[in-house]
Amino acid sequence: MSLYEKLNNYLSEAETWIAANITGTETLAAISADNEDMTRPLLCRIAVCHALLFAIPSLDLVLTPNGFGIVNNQNIVPASKERVERLIATIEKQRDDTIILLLEKLRKKAQWVDSDAGRYWAETLFPNIDVCERMGIKEHLWDGYQRLRPQIIAIETLIANGFISPELMHDLHDYQFGDMCNSLSADAKSAWAYLLTRLQSEVLYQLGGQPPRQQYLADLVNFIRNNIGLFQQWAESDTAKLYTPPVFVNKKEAQGYFF
């Protein structure tokens, strides 16, 4: 049995994994059917790497100077456990690096952006697994992202409710995807990019175990208020009311009335 035949089931499982976690079924089918699509080679690489991650432990497989070899004769001996683990780590890194490239390109595909898969990646200020590298995580990026994502969402929710507003936070998520950014004026793009970068910095700061920087966040609120024409989502939100208390009126019928 050839190596391809041995890998065939693993490749099918890899495609299912890609559809469930990255592309969605329709986008995967569309890319697979278009030989000219620039993302197709990336998908193929991810599928092969993901398949090998699960196949290598169950195959008599080693990496030789001429490529992969199947241990089935006296000329090739099985690799040590340490070498196999290094091989798996290398392939996993190749897969994760390719996922980063693929997600960058998918953000330009309207079909994907509007899909359930695209919306999953648009739920935070970090729509890619490379956030792990910004946190100093150098390996197992996919797994690392799955651990970080709930923490990111929790931090962003607190920032949204207390400072930025859920409405503006939602649109900042969408800002990173295609059409919305293109529809903004030059001044708006600059302001939104500034706010996005500063918020990402705060989320990363808190992910590192630090408490919220209250003054830092208050300064961002002041930035929004000073550019309120560019952030109408915030102006119309309940969060904005926290920063615009009602004006005191000295009424005679009130208990605290004074002359």
PLM regions and their residue ranges:
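Catalytic-loop motifs flanking and including active-site residues across diverse enzymes
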Residues: 47
